[in-house]
């Protein structure tokens, strides 16, 4: 008899609802996953950042944008109520994104943050999924939180194994 390790899941952001499409409850989704066909497959269960559970009924691509129909969302008004919501899926925590430049929130939260010159800044407290880009909320001991856009130019190094990331902030960014 073999013992298999118990699967532990974590919540990962897979998309953000942009707006209603049409009058029958479809919504546009800004995809934030490396595998949209699997994450948004019919029957997939997702939760929103407000805790609402949604089941994917069907999807289709339209003009380069993913359109999703959720069970029980049958009209434009109900669909519009979902506008701006971040969608999360449960993922086995042992699975990493295929793209080595992509990270799940749980991999970043709790990481030590330092500048490229070695100055300690703090710890990643949260990943904010804003309409334009993701932003790292960095908890600092004395100066309150710092907010750094999670883009390669400002975050040139992420070391998941060492639980550390390095930032290259322009002058004044950490003082905002």
Curated annotation (Swiss-Prot):
Annotated ranges, domain PRC barrel: 100-173
Record bears the keyword Chaperone: yes
InterPro entries: PRC_barrel-like_sf, PRC_RimM, RimM, RimM_N, RimM_N_sf, Transl_B-barrel_sf
Alphabetized Gene3D superfamilies for the sequence: PRC-barrel domain, RimM
Gene Ontology CC annotations of this record: cytoplasm; ribosome
Disulfide bridge partners, by residue number: none
Keyword set includes Transport: no
Subcellular localization, as worded in the UniProt entry: Cytoplasm
Gene Ontology biological process: ribosomal small subunit biogenesis; rRNA processing
Role played: An accessory protein needed during the final step in the assembly of 30S ribosomal subunit, possibly for assembly of the head region. Essential for efficient processing of 16S rRNA. May be needed both before and after RbfA during the maturation of 16S rRNA. It has affinity for free ribosomal 30S subunits but not for 70S ribosomes.
PANTHER family cross-referenced by the UniProt entry: RIBOSOME MATURATION FACTOR RIMM
Family listed: Belongs to the RimM family.
Subunit organization: Binds ribosomal protein uS19.
Swiss-Prot/TrEMBL domain comment: The PRC barrel domain binds ribosomal protein uS19.
Name of the protein in its database record: Ribosome maturation factor RimM
Gene: rimM
């Amino acid at each position: 008899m073999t013992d298999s390790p118990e699967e532990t899941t974590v919540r990962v952001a897979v998309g953000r609802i942009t707006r209603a499409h049409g009058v029958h409850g479809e919504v546009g989704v800004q995809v934030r996953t490396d595998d949209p066909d699997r994450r948004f497959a019919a029957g997939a269960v997702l939760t929103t950042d407000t805790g609402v559970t949604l089941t994917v009924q069907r999807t289709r691509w339209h003009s380069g944008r993913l359109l999703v129909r959720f069970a029980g969302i049958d009209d434009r008004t109900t669909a519009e109520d979902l506008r701006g919501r971040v969608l999360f899926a449960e993922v086995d925590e042992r699975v990493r994104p295929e793209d080595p430049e992509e990270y799940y929130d749980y991999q970043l939260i709790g990481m030590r943050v330092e500048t490229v010159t070695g100055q300690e800044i703090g710890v990643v407290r949260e990943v904010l999924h804003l309409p334009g880009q993701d932003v790292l909320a960095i908890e600092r001991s004395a100066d309150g939180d710092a907010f750094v856009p999670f883009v390669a130019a400002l975050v040139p190094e992420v070391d998941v194994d060492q639980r550390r990331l390095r930032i290259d902030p322009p002058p004044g960014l950490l003082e905002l």
